[in-house]
Amino acid sequence: SHYPYPFIDGKFDSTLFPLAEWREASRLSLSVADVVDWSTGSGDADDPMLLDQIRTKILTRRGIQARRDQILVTMGTQNSLYLISQLLAHRETVVAMEEPGNFVARELCEKNGARVVPSPVDEQGLVIDGALAEVDVAYVTPSHQIPTAVAMPLERRQALMESAHVHDFMIIEDDYECETSYMDHPLPALRSMDKEGRVVYVASLSQVLAPGIRLGFIVANADFIESARQLRRQVLNHPPLNNQRAAAIFLSLGHYDALMPRLGRIFRERRMRLRGALSNIRGIPLEISPEVGGTTYWVRAPRDFDIAKLAIEAERHGIL
């Protein structure tokens, strides 16, 4: 059935896709010189043009400096987390996972035999407490916590980095929806604060452009990236180079830079409308997450509230 208002996790609004700009980038990627570049094969190497565009157009906005050999292109965040979990999570590993948090990341670690320790989340993200002294890896979503949508402030980020130093654990930083922040000056990525090579950074172009683009990337120390590349090679040498080149051209033409503020305006407007609609629901004291950006809206109702009844009533009005 068709629902006018499909609130489904991960569902993409195709009207937001930059069709003309992507078509231009795809057309330019089919020039003779570009086709020669991406069609002749490159072993397991990623497109150097895309690596440079990621370095200069995306990572610099997050305060991250990286060389080509510190970046690996993937098929998206889930693929990135799979590779990372294979390298960092095993039977002797204790992994701190945000609770509530990303169930996909949790399942990947658990399937490798790691012991996952649920770590509480408050209005500032992952709580930094003594329990972290016992872990080997911590998975966090500091820019836009999944699913509560809170952002980790600078002081909490610094405390997490200090805890990682003192207790000697690695950090998987999933920079989920970092580009759709409403903040005038987005907070620096944990990776940008890392002086010891403890942070493995994950981001995605698919979340911004469209899930079908299937491009993400990992940033870490060169030896970790080489291990991830060897693991990736067991499945595929690299994500399709024609897609990588089209994405590189899209970035180089400034289309990505222009898209970010446009998406931010649209998401902010939709968020305001949703907040207004929720505030009109009488008799239900709702707690709504702070407005830090992104596409998710975290709402908490009283424990005795019948959410199933609300879902049925919402469906009658075309809301799924």
Model-identified regions with their sequence ranges:
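N-terminal "arm"/small-domain region of PLP-dependent enzymes with the aminotransferase-like
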Residues: 1-45, 316-319
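Short glycine-rich anion-binding loops that position phosphate/pyrophosphate groups of nucleotides
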Residues: 12-13, 142-146, 207
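Conserved core of the PLP fold type I
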Residues: 26, 30-168, 172, 179-180, ...
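Conserved glycine-rich beta-strand-loop-beta hairpin in the small C-terminal domain of fold type I
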Residues: 101, 265-275, 286-300, 307-313
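Short, contiguous acidic/charged loop-to-helix segments that flank catalytic cores in large enzymes
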Residues: 121, 147-151, 233-238, 264-265, ...
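PLP-dependent aminotransferase class I/II
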Residues: 199-280, 288-289
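Conserved PLP-binding active-site segment of the aspartate aminotransferase-like
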Residues: 220, 298-305, 320
